[in-house]
């Protein structure tokens, strides 16, 4: 596995791979590597010849009103996991290399930002999308893989790449789960044994709401209440909301034929629930018949 901190070097490496006729994949992570990240690499290896991991755990990006602190991650641990998974190129973006002077360019996505549920303020999300756009520009033509667990981020990245006509395709991969249905996340390690035992209720509640929709429920709040009723005895729900999957627009009705309903019938139920002080997020997709 080749490791580099220089964006010019990783660009040169990937250009050489493409020139040799090989398909390139990119997987991005902020550190805290777990089985969910490795599953992205596994999918990338199925579809491409060369896999590059962009590890952003060392990166601190600043903006006019403050900064986003670097993650406190174990680089050596993550490197070992990715090398064992068969990653070819391991790129560690460094601020001094990427941003030798303050950046004045930021992505604005007002049409989507106004729909975000339970996410950080818009300025933070614009910074995040800008960072991903920067990394895709460095990677060049590629397939890039993100997990569906963070659905809102995934959709924003996909829309950004499409709107800018980047020579990259953002692919969503199914959420990797524990045998009991809990979405794999670094946050799971913060749960007490009792909280971890209760955590499967989140995905079970979302599944129950999806089943209610499949059985004919078309009121979004009523569908959410199916999940909330299961969760309140064991956790503190922050939100459960139904959105149009491709636009993140919150829905009141789930009927595609009704005004304001999902235009293509594709709905995503998004949830954030606190077990103690630890918030867990998850989501599930539902297809509502359009006829």
Swiss-Prot record:
SUPFAM superfamilies: Nucleotidylyl transferase. It catalyses: (R)-pantoate + beta-alanine + ATP = (R)-pantothenate + AMP + diphosphate + H(+). GO terms for cellular component: cytosol. Keywords: ATP-binding, Cytoplasm, Ligase, Nucleotide-binding, Pantothenate biosynthesis. One of its GO terms (molecular function) is pantoate-beta-alanine ligase activity. Belongs to the pantothenate synthetase family. Catalyzes the condensation of pantoate with beta-alanine in an ATP-dependent reaction via a pantoyl-adenylate intermediate. This is Pantothenate synthetase 1. It comes from Frankia alni (strain DSM 45986 / CECT 9034 / ACN14a).
